[in-house]
């Protein structure tokens, strides 16, 4: 199965500027949808807040040209065939929340034998990662738009993933917002059901109270085991590059904690049925 190639489009000199968008018209007709899942699934507390941000001309161009080839709207309507999505049967790592995509692109370039399915709702970041993938020839990156929970629950098969990365999720620091944090027992159970035995769950955060919550929750969960013999946090592995956001935090004296847990074999997870995350 061949890997799809991105189309290229060049504007000629003197080409007229795009017309103004009519009221109600999609922002990017061939790009990501504003709410791909719509109201087809139950309302629940979300760990993210979609926000409108300025999209540069380069990002808009990438969204229009490359989304039909390398983009995916999370609508929950079907079970994904990951080999078809990537054009090969290499291992797939899911990354939830990639910001502007620089670290994602760097990891994809360093490990061409692993496919990365990167999920975010931030339109400028989606466009920038698509641009980086084309610029650097990264055929192992696909960009997904929407709710990662719906993707995991409705669109991925049990044991489909060889890894899961959650780098610097929103810490929701106010106590009344802690319920919005992504790393919760219910999420970990869902994630465990979609990770193959031995797959790595890698989290990183610079918010220490959230790091402690992550460590406590992962340690208590029967689907995961800490790769650290001391049961604590891990040093940043060399394969995880420093992000722009992380550098800013380090400059302010923030402490960054990495957590690396492996998905334990099925037989070690008493009472769990594959495909039944809850």
List where the protein language model places each region.
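A short glycine-rich, Lys/Arg-flanked "PGG" loop and its adjoining helix->strand segment in the class I
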Residues: 183-197
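Conserved beta-strand signature within the Rossmann-like core of class I S-adenosyl-L-methionine
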Residues: 197-205
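Conserved beta-strand/loop positions that form the S-adenosyl-L-methionine
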Residues: 96, 119
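Class I S-adenosyl-L-methionine
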Residues: 212-278
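S-adenosyl-L-methionine
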Residues: 2-94, 102-109, 130-159
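Conserved SAM/SAH-binding beta-strand->alpha-helix loop
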Residues: 122
């Amino acid at each position: 199965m061949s890997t799809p190639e991105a189309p290229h489009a060049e504007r000629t000199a003197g080409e007229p500027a795009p017309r103004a968008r009519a009221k109600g018209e999609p922002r990017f007709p061939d790009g990501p949808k504003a709410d791909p899942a719509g109201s087809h699934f139950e309302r629940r507390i979300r760990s993210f807040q979609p926000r409108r941000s300025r999209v540069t001309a380069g990002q808009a161009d990438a969204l229009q040209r490359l989304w039909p080839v390398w983009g995916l709207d999370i609508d929950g309507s079907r079970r994904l065939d990951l080999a078809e999505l990537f054009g090969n049967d290499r291992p797939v790592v899911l990354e939830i929340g990639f910001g502007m995509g620089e670290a994602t692109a760097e990891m994809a370039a360093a490990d061409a034998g692993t496919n990365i399915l990167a999920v975010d709702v931030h339109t400028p970041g989606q466009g920038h990662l698509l641009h980086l993938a084309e610029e650097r020839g990264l055929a192992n990156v696909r960009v997904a738009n929407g709710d990662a929970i719906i993707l995991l629950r409705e669109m991925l098969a049990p044991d489909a993933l060889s890894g899961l990365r959650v780098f610097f999720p929103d810490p929701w620091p106010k106590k009344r917002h802690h319920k919005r944090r992504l790393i919760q027992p219910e999420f970990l159970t869902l994630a465990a059901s979609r990770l193959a035995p031995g797959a790595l769950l890698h989290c990183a955060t610079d918010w220490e109270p959230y790091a402690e919550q992550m460590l406590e929750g992962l340690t208590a969960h029967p689907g995961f085991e800490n790769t650290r013999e001391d049961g604590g946090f891990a040093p940043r592995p060399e394969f995880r590059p420093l992000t722009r956001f992380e550098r800013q935090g380090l400059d302010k004296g923030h402490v960054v904690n990495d957590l690396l847990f492996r998905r334990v074999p099925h037989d070690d997870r008493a009472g769990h049925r594959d495909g039944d995350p809850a």
